[in-house]
Regions:
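Transmembrane helix boundary and interhelical junction motifs in multipass membrane proteins
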Residues: 4, 10-22, 93-102
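Alpha-helical transmembrane segments of multipass membrane proteins
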Residues: 15-18, 43-48, 99, 121-129, ...
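Transmembrane helix-bundle signature of multi-pass membrane transporters/permeases
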Residues: 8-13, 37-43, 118-123
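Membrane-interface alpha-helices at helix entry/exit sites of multi-pass transporters
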Residues: 31-38, 109-120
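Helix-loop junctions at the membrane interface of multi-pass solute transporters
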Residues: 22-26, 103-108
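Short amphipathic alpha-helical segments
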Residues: 84, 98-102, 115
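Membrane-interfacial helix-loop-helix
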Residues: 1-6, 26-92, 131-140
């Protein structure tokens, strides 16, 4: 059980879209999947926030420039339309919490506010996706 919790936690650092299916495949209880994914994802964005400006340089080296620009444009449209609140909540679902935090640091003036709203987005979407995934498995 501890091994499964650790696996879901560490995968949660990489993003919520990856750890929820892994937890469901390992037949873990949805509450534990949700808790460990939330803790892991929040730790992941905290690390990104603390490393700050070096993140964009890292992404531009290792990812295709067009991929970053496409995600930045999508993120910028989201930010212009909904502000930091919408960016944190909807960006978490659309492009994942790590990319939202990393790219959001380049356009948001207050990283702590972005961290807060991205954390809220992580809690909302992890809970929703875990419940829907569990519900889908229990139907079949």
């Amino acid at each position: 059980m501890l091994g499964q919790l650790f696996i879901v936690f560490t995968i949660g650092i990489l993003g919520i879209w990856k750890s929820i299916p892994v937890g469901l495949v390992m037949k873990m209880h949805p509450l534990w999947i949700c808790i460990m994914t939330i803790i892991g994802a929040i730790l992941g964005i905290l690390i990104i926030m603390l490393t700050g400006s070096k993140i964009k340089n890292f992404f531009s080296k290792w990812m295709k420039a067009s991929s970053i620009e496409k995600k930045e444009n999508r993120l910028l449209r989201l930010f212009n339309k909904y502000g930091v609140h919408g960016l944190g909540i909807f960006g978490t679902l659309i492009i994942g919490p790590n990319m939202t935090m990393a790219l959001g640091l380049t356009i948001v003036y207050n990283p702590k506010l972005l961290f807060l709203w991205t954390s809220i987005g992580i809690i909302i979407w992890t809970t929703t996706l875990t419940y829907l995934g569990y519900l889908g498995i229990s139907i079949f």
